[in-house]
Amino acid sequence: VAFEPLSLEEIQIIFIYRKIISNDEKGKILIENGLSAIAPMLRRAPDPEGEEGYTLFHYSLREHILKSQDMANSVQTAKEAFCELAMKPDDQEELTNYLYRTGIDHFIDVKDFKAAGKALLNFYWLLNLFNLGKTPSDINSYWSQLPISKQQIDACYLFSLMGKDHVGYSDGD
């Protein structure tokens, strides 16, 4: 469910955070052995910073995993873990850049639109997004995925810009 390749260290931090492995050499070896066991399904690829990480070899495998009933619980647990981590992106130094770059994507993925909106209104988060290579177009794309309601303080402006027939419009919160 990661939105970009993750390094061994980043994967290890996620597993430590979820208390799946210990924070020592044994935990690291367990991750290395696990990656070796599924190596035919993985490929190495750079993240936006040029750091090499692991990703699934084929996009179709990712889609299969995301849609498989057998994997539904594991996928949901992983999505929740990424969202929890993204709530405080500075807490895990090795993941900070990844969490700022993709945290809003993770919030939107689990339909936590409130968290996504709060991140988009957080100037420190926006500064990090721009410093990590995101553009105003990327920010606009995030906003376009969020529902709009009459309850928002800026609703009158949004409705005049996008219209009541906008795909994100709703009468609720």
Q: Where in the sequence are the language-model features?
A:
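Solenoid-repeat scaffolds in large eukaryotic assemblies
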Residues: 103, 115-119, 155
